[in-house]
Amino acid sequence: ERNRAFVEAYRKRFGEYPSYNAEEAYAGLHMLARAVEKAKSTQAEAVRRAFEADGGLVYDAPEGRKRMRPEDHQVFEGLVWGYTKHTPDYPFAILDRLRIIPANDTAYPTQCKR
């Protein structure tokens, strides 16, 4: 539902389907806004602490849940995989035989130390 609402709002405003990058930028700015709200500040150190609090910021983006790892601020999300195919329903290729690999299955260990 979140994704459908995002696509509809984007198409209404810009007259075209959103790209993958459009959704990522939208989600990234919303994650930043959540951290600023949580910090009650725009000061960098306060926002950093908000990103890292409680095991890392979590945001339910249009494409799914994203989690920021507190140690290195890497954002993890489910990995979408599939075969591309063209249909008359869309002016671009879509994914067929879609598979979503959980973020925990693709996360790599951080080398960052605090």
Q: Which residues fall in each region the model found?
A:
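Extracytosolic ligand-binding ectodomains
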Residues: 1-114
